[in-house]
């Protein structure tokens, strides 16, 4: 008879191919190779201002108008710890180079956390914490005829040591950013 052993992996492992061996009395009787690699995909991006019902409970008006809802999925075979959410390009408030914190406001009532573990096959919703669509900007403006641009959302993980990026097209239409109709769509679709 054999026994089954589960070993928690955590998020401090080097991704790659591992060999799992079945050992009986110091003799390897079977071996299986397994690739353990996270693969984070940005499934959906929503503006809080356009989807207030999807914001977390007790989100204030400023948070609703300036933050973003991001749905991510790990389609890989190993866990990932998301450590930074970045916005670059034509957004009112791009993520500063020297960001203090992660830019992530993941809410799991009653606890809020700023880094997020995503296991293989898991889907999670997180919220931005840097007000990328806040009402003040030196980068973009809202005009009655509409202003178009493009921005990139990046998620950095500490296991894969890379940034997953997704580009979006954006249009700002209205009198000012406080009362602006902002539409986004995934680029390259």
Q: Model-predicted segments: where are they?
A:
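Acidic, polar-rich N-terminal leader regions of halophilic archaeal proteins
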Residues: 1-189
